[in-house]
């Protein structure tokens, strides 16, 4: 049994807080029960609430992000199916995707004193931090890679935590929000 299961991770969520995710600047659900009914007009955010909870409960798994965007057909236009980039900007409130953009989902259960928390943030890409730069330059035999703009990108960082458990990953994202499969 994992530490998260022992701490009540598998337990039902009682409260969910969503910040800057899709259509929500800030949204909270309280007093959730075993069965909950989300009611609202078309395009009011019902599916977005379920998606936020899904990403939270996926413990930051990169596949959950890809599956979510795939189910909505959120990919960069003009991309071939075999080389498709997923358009991550749709996950951010107002499609705002720039350095400092961030969304988060937090959940609390009755059985645990710990909060489950997911944060997805965008920062400036620092190519010096990425060791593959030299290898890529040699492989492509490019003398002036900056002139070609190959490294104009953002860093996307995903952090998930629950008590002492932590999971994180990062990936390069194009300036337009294109995410290749992590």
What are these regions (language model features)?
Residues 1-10, 60-182:
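Phosphate-coordinating catalytic segments in nucleotide- and nucleic-acid-processing enzymes
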Residues 2-58, 67-75:
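Pre-Walker A-like glycine/lysine-rich segment at the N-terminus of P-loop NTPase domains
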């Amino acid at each position: 049994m994992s530490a998260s299961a022992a701490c009540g991770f598998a337990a039902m969520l009682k409260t969910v807080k969503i910040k800057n995710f899709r259509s929500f600047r800030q949204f909270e659900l309280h007093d959730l029960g075993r069965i909950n009914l989300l009611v609202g007009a078309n395009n009011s955010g019902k599916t977005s609430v379920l998606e936020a909870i899904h990403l939270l409960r996926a413990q930051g798994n990169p596949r959950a992000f890809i599956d979510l965007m795939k189910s909505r057909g959120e990919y960069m236009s003009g991309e071939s199916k075999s080389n498709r980039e997923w358009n991550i900007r749709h996950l951010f409130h107002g499609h705002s995707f720039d350095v400092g953009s961030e969304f988060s989902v937090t959940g609390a259960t009755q059985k645990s004193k710990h909060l489950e928390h997911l944060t997805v943030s965008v920062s400036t890409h620092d190519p010096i931090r990425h060791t593959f730069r030299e290898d890529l330059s040699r492989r492509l035999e490019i003398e002036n890679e900056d002139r070609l703009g190959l490294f104009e990108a953002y860093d996307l960082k995903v952090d998930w935590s629950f008590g002492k458990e932590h999971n994180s990953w990062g990936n390069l994202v194009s300036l337009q929000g294109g995410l290749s499969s992590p």
